[in-house]
Amino acid sequence: MTAPTTRKDLMIVNMGPQHPSMHGVLRLIVTLDGEDVVDCEPILGYLHRGMEKIAENRTIIQYLPYVTRWDYLATMFTEAITINGPEQLGNIQVPKRASYIRVIMLELSRIASHLLWLGPFMADIGAQTPFFYIFRERELIYDLFEAATGMRMMHNYFRIGGVAADLPYGWIDKCLDFCDYFLTGVAEYQKLITRNPIFLERVEGVGIIGRDEAVNWGLSGPMLRASGIEWDLRKVDHYESYDEFDWQVQWQREGDSLARYLVRIGEMTESIKIIQQALEGIPGGPYENLEMRRFDRLKDPEWNDFEYRFISKKPSPTFELSKQELYVRVEAPKGELGIFLIGDQSVFPWRWKIRPPGFINLQILPQLVKRMKLADIMTILGSIDIIMGEVDR
C-alpha cells in the first residue's frame, strides 16, 4: 500500500469589513497555510466620503464641522490642523491664552484617543476588564469637553486666531481634579496589564519593526517612537506653546507590539503633566484675536438693538487664502497628521491634501503579519491603531 501524498492547500479567509473585531470597515483578505499567514491584502475605501474635494468648495469655517469626521476619536487635532494652515497663510497671531487652551484641549483629546485604543486592543487579545475601565476615565474627559465646547464629540471648537469660547467658570479646577484622579487610573492599568504574563505572551516580540524599516515606510507617532526613534512634532516643530512646558518624548527600542503599548501608556502620563502645567500657568487676556474688537463694539449704541441681536451677535469671519503653497502638520495620537494647502486668492482652497497617519501606518501591515499566526493579526492590527474615517477620508 502506497503512503498518501501530502497536499498543500492554501485557504483564503475574509476578515471584515462588517466584523465587530475589526477596527472600523477594514477588509483583510488573508491567505493561510494552516494557522500560518502566507499573504494579507487590505481592502480600503468603504468609508470614503470625498473629504478633500469637499474642502475645495467650502470656506474654512464652513469646512470645520466636516474635519471632525476624519479621526472621530481625536477631533481636536483635525480642527487644529484645519485652522493652523490658514493662520500661517494669513500670518494671523494667536493670543497666548488661546494657545494654552488649545494645548489643554489637544492633550485631553490625546488621552481620550489612547484610552479608546487601549480598551479594544486588550479586548482583541482576550482581556475584557480594561475595556470597561477605560470608559470610566474617558467619560470624565468627555464631561470636560461638553462643559467647555458644548459637545462631547465633534466639538467644532477651534477658530482661526483662537478658540470659539473661553473656558467656563470652575472648569480649570475640575480639570485639575481629573488630572490627579487619572494618574491613579494609569497606575492601575499598568498594575493590571504591563506585567501580566498572558498579555506579555501575546505582544512581546510580535510585529517587530526595525529602526530603518520604520523610517523607510514613513511611519510616525507611537509606531515610529516604539522603534527607537525619538521624534515628536511637538518638540520638532515648536507649534502652539509646547516649548514652555517640561515634558519628555516617550520612546522604546524594541519595535514590537509591547513597545507600542508602552509608548502610548507613557504618553498619557506626559499629557497629564502638560495639562497640569498649562492649567497652572494659563494667562489672562482674549481667547481669540477678534475678541478685542468685539469689546470695543460694546460701546456702540446699536449693539443692543433688537434687529442686530436678532441677526447675530458673533459672526464668524471668512479669510481669503493667499496664493501660495503650505504644508502644516501636528502630532496627533496616531502619528503625523498633515495638510498640504494651496491658496488661490480666494476664500476656497485650490487644493486640500490630507496626510492621515493611519493610512501611512497601515501600509506596513501585510509585511508584519506574514509568517505569523492567524491570531497575531488582531494583535498587530490593534497595535497600529487605525481609524477608518481618516484612512479612507
Swiss-Prot record:
GO terms for molecular function: NAD binding; oxidoreductase activity, acting on NAD(P)H, quinone or similar compound as acceptor; quinone binding. PANTHER family: NADH DEHYDROGENASE [UBIQUINONE] IRON-SULFUR PROTEIN 2, MITOCHONDRIAL, NADH-UBIQUINONE OXIDOREDUCTASE 49 KDA SUBUNIT. It is found in: Plastid, Chloroplast thylakoid membrane. GO terms for biological process: photosynthesis, light reaction. The gene is ndhH. InterPro entries: NADH_Q_OxRdtase_suD, NADH_UbQ_OxRdtase_49kDa_CS, NDH1_su_D/H, NiFe-Hase_large. Coiled coil: none annotated. Its EC number is 7.1.1.-. Its main location: plastid. Belongs to the complex I 49 kDa subunit family. NDH is composed of at least 16 different subunits, 5 of which are encoded in the nucleus. PROSITE patterns: COMPLEX1_49K. The lineage of its organism: Eukaryota, Viridiplantae, Streptophyta, Embryophyta, Tracheophyta. It catalyses: a plastoquinone + NADH + (n+1) H(+)(in) = a plastoquinol + NAD(+) + n H(+)(out); a plastoquinone + NADPH + (n+1) H(+)(in) = a plastoquinol + NADP(+) + n H(+)(out). NDH shuttles electrons from NAD(P)H:plastoquinone, via FMN and iron-sulfur (Fe-S) centers, to quinones in the photosynthetic chain and possibly in a chloroplast respiratory chain. The immediate electron acceptor for the enzyme in this species is believed to be plastoquinone. Couples the redox reaction to proton translocation, and thus conserves the redox energy in a proton gradient. It comes from Solanum tuberosum. This is NAD(P)H-quinone oxidoreductase subunit H, chloroplastic. It holds the Pfam family Complex1_49kDa. It is a peripheral membrane protein.
